[in-house]
Structure formats: C-alpha cells, structure tokens
Amino acid sequence: MTLGLMAQTQHMKFMGIPLNGTISTFQQKLVAKGCKHDVKRSKAVGVGCRTFTGTFFGEEAIIFVYYNAKTKVVYRAKACIERNSEDDIIRKYDEVKSALEEKYPDANIAKGECDGYESIGFYTVQGAIGLYVTRSDNYSYDYALHIDYSDDANDKKNENSKMNDL
C-alpha cells in the first residue's frame, strides 16, 4: 500500500487566527478573543466586509474582516488604530514596524509612501502585511494606522471568483 502525503496550505494569521474558513467561524474566534461585532459599521461597509472593535497590539482598534460574498471565505483582515496626534501615530507606526520586522525576519520588504508617510509591506509565503498611515478630516480622528493582513491562497481564490463573473 502506498501512502501519499498531501501538502497542507499554511495561511497567514491575524491575531493568531488563520485567514481561512468562513466569516461566521472567523467571527466566533474574534469574539472569543474579546472583540465585538460592530453591526452598524458592518452594514455601512456592505457585504464582503464585517467590522469589529477590539484590542490589537495592546490598542483599541477597529477591525475589518474581508470575505468573498459568494463563498463566505475570509481572505483579508485589517486593524486600524486611530490617533489625533501626528507624533503619536508616527510613534505607533515605528513600534508596530519594529515588531513586524522582529516577527517576520525572512519576509521580503517593500517600502513606499501613503498620504506623505512611509509605508511598508512584508511579503511571506503565506501572504502579506501592509503597514501605513492615513490622514482624515472626515472622522473623529485625524490619523489612522492600518495593519493590513492578506492571505495569499484565499486572496487568489477571491480574485478568481470575481474573474469568473466576467
């Protein structure tokens, strides 16, 4: 008898949760970590994204979880930390950047710019993490730090699903 071994896809993790499975399962895991579903904001962003409030990297954050509207499979999650001070947001950016560099020492790194601030992307076999700052005059805060995780395998499946509609 021949035994075959199947390679199992490793998925990018957000808050220790693999970016895989259905939005319902992912939501249960976030809630178990103390996050709260923000129903009002979720309705505003529409199908394909659910929002939560919770703690990320020791800070109050708004969490966005993106999923394929047809399959309900999660492929991306993002935490946004808000600040009213430019100095505060830059300090937090530097702190998170250092932590990501430590956690992902073998990642390919790409630097860029967003809203006049440095941005950085960490690329691994499992996916990518984008770190960037945005400015806003339309919200109750002036600056937001985005920590944006994307799972490579499920992001590709999501894109293929959309392309099948064409």
Where are the language model's segments positioned?
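Mid-chain, structured segments of secreted extracytoplasmic proteins
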Residues: 49-94
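Bacterial Sec-dependent N-terminal signal peptides
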Residues: 1-8
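Non-cytosolic coordination micro-motifs
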Residues: 8-47, 78-166
